[in-house]
């Protein structure tokens, strides 16, 4: 999975897909009442990137729908996976459930069109930066189920993104009954070098049949760093330069071992690489 990083403006969706991304990540900010309001990263962010792009959340979700709705003029066949980087650290722990509810309400209305009409082809990963906010998952799932559309949860996965100890992450999932659809991230801003020790631990847990189904690293922009991540067996690389990863995947060491995920692939199915 080539995961385009910090795609917070609608016009950037097409830009990153054109560069080769089959997945995009964006930052979701909440107000003091736990409502998701807009996509925005802010300063500081990755080196050599603009940090200030933003859209209202409802408008961004509508754009995601257009890009993953077969028959729509803006439909992008190979755009498959969306990573919602949920900036919940601005909230109290007690607000996590409400944040999940309100996130579900927005996605159900603006991306899934209230469960009506032609289904969209995108899959979602809810990426949470705080292990204490596990109730966000519960709030999200219970809200979708209450709307009579539990089948939509087949298209939703989860990630805790704070580089916590893997056993602690697994315990958080146990608290809300999650046993699959788990992506595990590992990383740091592209301005700083980070080793792959924890990423390799996550890969081992994936291959050992644990709760982790997929592993991705962020934010990786250099050719050699991408090669190192692929050698470690990750499923996805989040990058500011999808075209660089496209070129790396064409190299002899990787062209027969990896292929780009397509819209017929299940982003929650475990592969041992």
From Swiss-Prot:
Localization, UniProt: Secreted
Annotated CDD domains: GDPD_like_SMaseD_PLD
UniProt keywords, alphabetically: Cytolysis, Dermonecrotic toxin, Disulfide bond, Hemolysis, Lipid degradation, Lipid metabolism, Lyase, Magnesium, Metal-binding, Secreted, Toxin
Reactions the enzyme catalyzes: an N-(acyl)-sphingosylphosphocholine = an N-(acyl)-sphingosyl-1,3-cyclic phosphate + choline; an N-(acyl)-sphingosylphosphoethanolamine = an N-(acyl)-sphingosyl-1,3-cyclic phosphate + ethanolamine; a 1-acyl-sn-glycero-3-phosphocholine = a 1-acyl-sn-glycero-2,3-cyclic phosphate + choline; a 1-acyl-sn-glycero-3-phosphoethanolamine = a 1-acyl-sn-glycero-2,3-cyclic phosphate + ethanolamine
SUPFAM superfamilies per record: PLC-like phosphodiesterases
UniProt EC number: 4.6.1.-
Source organism (scientific name): Loxosceles arizonica
InterPro entries, alphabetized: PLC-like_Pdiesterase_TIM-brl
GO MF annotations, alphabetized: lyase activity; metal ion binding; phosphoric diester hydrolase activity; toxin activity
Top-level taxon in the UniProt lineage: Eukaryota
Disulfide pairings: 45-51, 47-191
Function: Dermonecrotic toxins cleave the phosphodiester linkage between the phosphate and headgroup of certain phospholipids (sphingolipid and lysolipid substrates), forming an alcohol (often choline) and a cyclic phosphate. This toxin acts on sphingomyelin (SM). It may also act on ceramide phosphoethanolamine (CPE), lysophosphatidylcholine (LPC) and lysophosphatidylethanolamine (LPE), but not on lysophosphatidylserine (LPS), and lysophosphatidylglycerol (LPG). It acts by transphosphatidylation, releasing exclusively cyclic phosphate products as second products.
Any one GO CC term of the record: extracellular region
GO BP terms: killing of cells of another organism; lipid catabolic process
Binding site for Mg(2+): 25, 27, 85
Name assigned to this protein: Dermonecrotic toxin LarSicTox-alphaII1
Main location: secreted
